[in-house]
């Protein structure tokens, strides 16, 4: 798959699966709403600060993020680290009308945080082959990009 094809897979995915190690050393996965991307290497996820995965990621940020399209038999697993953000600029970027249902105190709710996944490498597959992504390849592809809602852009014509 080309990097543009991988970016298309990421953008048309409404959800991703994040893998991490919990505080007891067990491997865990969570399905997360993940539509904000800065190329292939950076992804933003809004979530509850009180959730178990956030507590674990604050102690050990090593994680993987998996995007897939089961109907096309395509997948991309990115390996990297997570930073937990509480800064208003991140919260505002991902805040949506109706989020008050989950965060009653609004954008400043202490239970509202943003995970920033930063990829260091990746592995992809498709029916016609598989391959690896290195940190320099990801950085070159992502150069000059800003965060954008890729799902919205990919599905604007729908």
Model-found features: residue ranges?
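Charged, amphipathic alpha-helical segments
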Residues: 1-4, 99-100
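A short, Trp-centered hydrophobic/proline-enriched beta-strand micro-motif
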Residues: 8-25, 63-67
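General beta-strand recognition
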Residues: 17, 42-44, 123
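Residue-level signal for well-ordered, solvent-exposed loop/turn and beta-edge residues enriched
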Residues: 26-28, 81
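Conserved beta-strand in the GNAT
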Residues: 31-33
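A short mixed-secondary-structure module that forms the rim of ligand-binding clefts
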Residues: 35-72
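Charged, gly/pro-rich active-site loop segments
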Residues: 77-158
């Amino acid at each position: 798959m080309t990097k543009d094809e991988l970016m298309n897979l990421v953008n048309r995915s409404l959800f991703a699966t994040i893998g991490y190690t919990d505080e007891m050393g067990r491997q865990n996965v969570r399905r997360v709403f993940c539509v904000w991307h800065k190329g292939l290497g950076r992804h933003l996820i809004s979530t509850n600060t009180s959730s178990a995965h956030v507590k674990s990621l604050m102690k050990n940020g090593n994680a993987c993020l998996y995007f897939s399209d089961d109907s096309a038999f395509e997948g991309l697993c990115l390996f990297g680290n997570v930073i937990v953000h509480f800064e208003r600029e991140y919260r505002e970027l991902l805040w949506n009308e109706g989020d008050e249902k989950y965060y009653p105190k609004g954008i400043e709710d202490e239970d509202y945080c943003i995970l920033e996944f930063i990829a260091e490498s990746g592995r992809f597959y498709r029916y016609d082959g598989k391959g690896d992504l290195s940190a320099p390849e990801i950085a070159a592809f992502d150069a000059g990009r800003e965060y954008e809602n890729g799902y919205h852009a990919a599905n604007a014509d729908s």
